[in-house]
């Protein structure tokens, strides 16, 4: 016979590993959403600070090598 059937008793379940045991609590929180705004204001502050950082970097970049001979007000 070309195909061979495997008995259900010979199949093993999922293996348990140390890493899996450590990560299981994180996976059990999947799909749960904290009520209210949560950490949204903190994320807004972080985004604002990052935007300021990017604008400072852009200012430094624009006034450096590329525009050496150009006077800007």
Swiss-Prot record:
Membrane-crossing segments per the record: 41-61
Output the Pfam families linked to this UniProt entry.
Answer: PsbH
Could you tell me the Gene Ontology terms of the biological process aspect for this record?
photosynthesis; protein stabilization
InterPro entries recorded: PSII_PsbH (IPR001056), PSII_PsbH_sf (IPR036863)
Sites of Phosphothreonine modification: 3
GO annotation, cellular component aspect = chloroplast thylakoid membrane; photosystem II
State its location(s): Plastid, Chloroplast thylakoid membrane
Q: What are the start and end residues of every segment in region (Disordered)?
A: 1-22
Does the keyword Chaperone belong to this entry? no
Q: How is it modified after translation?
A: Phosphorylation is a light-dependent reaction catalyzed by a membrane-bound kinase; phosphorylation occurs on Thr residue(s) in the N-terminus of the protein.
Cite the entry's keywords alphabetically: Chloroplast, Membrane, Phosphoprotein, Photosynthesis, Photosystem II, Plastid, Thylakoid, Transmembrane, Transmembrane helix
UniProt similarity note: Belongs to the PsbH family.
Q: Name the job this protein performs.
A: One of the components of the core complex of photosystem II (PSII), required for its stability and/or assembly. PSII is a light-driven water:plastoquinone oxidoreductase that uses light energy to abstract electrons from H(2)O, generating O(2) and a proton gradient subsequently used for ATP formation. It consists of a core antenna complex that captures photons, and an electron transfer chain that converts photonic excitation into a charge separation.
Its quaternary organisation is: PSII is composed of 1 copy each of membrane proteins PsbA, PsbB, PsbC, PsbD, PsbE, PsbF, PsbH, PsbI, PsbJ, PsbK, PsbL, PsbM, PsbT, PsbX, PsbY, PsbZ, Psb30/Ycf12, at least 3 peripheral proteins of the oxygen-evolving complex and a large number of cofactors. It forms dimeric complexes.
Q: What is this protein called?
A: Photosystem II reaction center protein H
Underlying gene? psbH
């Amino acid at each position: 016979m070309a195909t061979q059937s495997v008995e259900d008793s010979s199949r093993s379940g999922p293996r348990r590993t140390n890493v899996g045991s450590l990560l299981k609590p994180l996976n059990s929180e999947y799909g749960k959403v904290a009520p209210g705004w949560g950490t949204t204001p903190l994320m807004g502050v972080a985004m604002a600070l990052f935007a300021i950082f990017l604008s400072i970097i852009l200012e430094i970049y624009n006034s450096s090598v590329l525009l050496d001979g150009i006077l800007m007000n």
